Amino acid sequence: AKLAPYKCWDRHTQALFEEHNEAKEDCILQNREEVIGLMEFIEKHNIRSYLEIGIWTGGLVRALHGVFDFDTVATADQGYAKTQGFEITLPAAVQSYWGDSDTPEFRAWREKLGHIDLVMIDGDHRYHGVKRDFEINREYPHRFLAFHDITGANRWTTGVAKFWDELNVGHKWEICRPHAEIGLDHSVMGIGIWSE
């Protein structure tokens, strides 16, 4: 119910994706049921600080901060949505880094953030990109690192799936639920959560 006001990836989004090979829509580009699962995880593990890497238009961070009112909320993004004609809308409390996460400037910014309970990595979906974001963020104080698109169901997300499958250290949780909003009885996205 808490997620009800927010549009997630639905049949319209899927049609855009199939037509243009990209989901260019101002919404949360995730499976609603999996976001609900993420919210359950956040509640169960008392997540009070959140960093999202790769935010599109900011829908997920708006929804999560709106529900959980994190003590610390931060985002890192290169602003791709703006180049596609969309506004990026973030809560006032958000600390934002605009630029590539593989830079000394990002590392300095991330270090200043300090401990983050949950880092959601949803930026570069290529294998080397997601691995790089994992390795960078693993260096800084955190409890959990999460990844979107672990199923690798389309050619744009196979790098995430490969990385997730190879990640054989620490503890892993998977949130993979049927994507009902597009009429599927299985997950084509998936959220993976990892801890040391």
Name each model feature, range by range.
Residues 1-120, 124-196:
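A short alpha-helical cap/connector motif
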